[in-house]
Amino acid sequence: MTVWIQNPFDSLPSEGGRKQRYWLMAEAFLRAGHRVTYWTSDFSHSGKRRREAPPSVHDGMEVAMVPTAPYSGNVSMRRIASHRAYARSWTRMACERGDRPDLIVSSMPTISAASVAISLGRRLSARVVIDVQDAWPETFERLAPNPLRPIAGALLAPLRREAQRIYRAADMVTGVCDRYRDLTGRDDYFRAYLGIEAPRHRFFEDLRYGTGGRRLVYSGNLGRSYDLDTVVKAVKADESLELDVAGFGEFSSDCPRVRFHGMLPAERLQALLAECDIGVIPMRDDSWVGIPNKMFDYAAAGLRIVTSLGGEAAGLVAKYRCGATYRPGVATSLAAAVSACGGIGRDASLEMCRREFDAIKIYDDYVGFVTMP
């Protein structure tokens, strides 16, 4: 079977980070004996810079770079224009090819590229899987400027209708968490967590772990979805706490026990996580995120997990007794959650990672589902 996978956002392994969802998915299709073309943007969403093109054939898959207009802000008209230009470029490149796919897997977002996937599926007689990685346009409503909040729902209604049209038109709909099942309106929705590679678990066996202390770490995007102010406030109020922050974006603190490392390559991030004790997931209370990428990194490192997310994330933390939850935006609640982690060893998170987040099993099962006759 010839498979096309389309996603403009995930980092590529050649950019220094760990393998992310769609690369891991592509490898699973290759393991099952399928031919894979991986379509992605030539502009890095996380780094906001032009990408260096990897080899056109990489690890057995073809990598096709789609020309994309740059943008600097995650919430901006320039980004919307960039997404539309990406969708047009992908349409043109796909139609110029001599080969035809049997299956197209398209991430959602973006809405415009997912819509192209539906159209290409009809034109090329291919089945189409829409894979929901984030809630669009619902996330836009949450991030709308305060003056626009009262009318954001009405302004975004056309995008919401288009998203629902895409979900109905797809042959299959999959996603990264159970929460998105209701969003799609599909009873046949298939959930596949983002996951993380199992070999990463063993990396930490050879590194020094934090010794039952109270050294916190946050890794990931430093955008508006995350509430680091509350974490810093809790650290300032308790001299036994330290915080390491690693990620892309702007961050500063006048507290000497708060350290900012910037964006770290995979090995340096692994080493930092191994030195810390507790991974923090400080999501705002109106977030649509089910389980963020950082939870997989923390679990693979054996960190105790403190999260303000409810739903699936809180349920898994409770099931494996590997951390605690706190009230979003409340520093005293976060401090209490940190204290509640005192008697928890790293094996609890590692067990959760082995049972729930093993990427090999997740994506082999995914391939089995979407290729069923």
Please tell me what each predicted stretch does.
Residues P8, P13, T68-I80, D99, ...:
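Acceptor-binding helix/loop patch of EC 2.4 sugar-transfer enzymes
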Residues M1-E62, M172, T230-D238, E242, ...:
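N-terminal subdomain of nucleotide-sugar transferases
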Residues Y226, P265-L272, D277-A299, V306-L316:
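Nucleotide-sugar-dependent
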Residues L207-Y226, V232-D238:
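Conserved donor-binding/catalytic core segment of Leloir-type glycosyltransferases
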Residues T40, V129, P137, A152-F204:
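Donor nucleotide-sugar binding/catalytic pocket of nucleotide-sugar-dependent glycosyltransferases
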Residues G213, D244-L273:
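Nucleotide-activated donor-binding/catalytic signature segment of Leloir-type glycosyltransferases, i.e.
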